[in-house]
Amino acid sequence: MIGTLSGIIEEVQDTSIILAVGGVGYIVHVSYRTLINCKRGDSIKLYIETYVNRDNVPQLYGFTDTEEQNCLKMLIKVSGINYRTALAILDRLTPDQLFSAIVNEDKAALKVGGVGAKLINRIFTELTPLVQKLEFNIMDKRGPSVEDSDALSALLSLGYEKTRVLNALEKVGVSHNLSDTVRFALKELSK
């Protein structure tokens, strides 16, 4: 099992890169967001997911951060979603956008090639409890307060995605009064 690969990008293809590591060139499938930042000759470290297809051919999927990698792991748990489909979803959505689409049951956001209405409904059914639990765990680390709940509502009303707001509130740390909490969270969200 491969956990990470660090090397030099030899070639950038349509949906993958060839990563030279110790004299071996690995074909690594990456999301569009990763692909647009890849340039031949650049050094890169990727977190790797390995999948062996029906023909017993191993395929490597690489991610620049563990958040996107964990989203892929979560998506492939849904019956009917394979690695390629999960990567197509991650091509279109950031992890925050994915969580938001699941929690808000935003069918249009999840509409990508190979993902029909039945599969989208299955994603909502199977992943909504998991995503809500993840959001609860973020708030639970600090112990939510009335100010946190009010700050969450205020920031959501400004149009920020719930997952981003929860992450910002987590980074703000110790609860402040409401106006300070919102101000510090807005600074965090603007980064």
From Swiss-Prot:
Gene name tied to this protein: ruvA
Any one cellular-component term (Gene Ontology): Holliday junction helicase complex
Role played: The RuvA-RuvB-RuvC complex processes Holliday junction (HJ) DNA during genetic recombination and DNA repair, while the RuvA-RuvB complex plays an important role in the rescue of blocked DNA replication forks via replication fork reversal (RFR). RuvA specifically binds to HJ cruciform DNA, conferring on it an open structure. The RuvB hexamer acts as an ATP-dependent pump, pulling dsDNA into and through the RuvAB complex. HJ branch migration allows RuvC to scan DNA until it finds its consensus sequence, where it cleaves and resolves the cruciform DNA.
Similarity comment: family membership: Belongs to the RuvA family.
Written domain comment of the UniProt record: Has three domains with a flexible linker between the domains II and III and assumes an 'L' shape. Domain III is highly mobile and contacts RuvB.
Domain III as annotated region, ranges: 149-191
Subunit and partners: Homotetramer. Forms an RuvA(8)-RuvB(12)-Holliday junction (HJ) complex. HJ DNA is sandwiched between 2 RuvA tetramers; dsDNA enters through RuvA and exits via RuvB. An RuvB hexamer assembles on each DNA strand where it exits the tetramer. Each RuvB hexamer is contacted by two RuvA subunits (via domain III) on 2 adjacent RuvB subunits; this complex drives branch migration. In the full resolvosome a probable DNA-RuvA(4)-RuvB(12)-RuvC(2) complex forms which resolves the HJ.
Region Flexible linker: start-end pairs: 146-149
Protein name, as recorded: Holliday junction branch migration complex subunit RuvA
Annotated segments matching region Domain I: 1-64
Molecular function (Gene Ontology), one example: four-way junction DNA binding
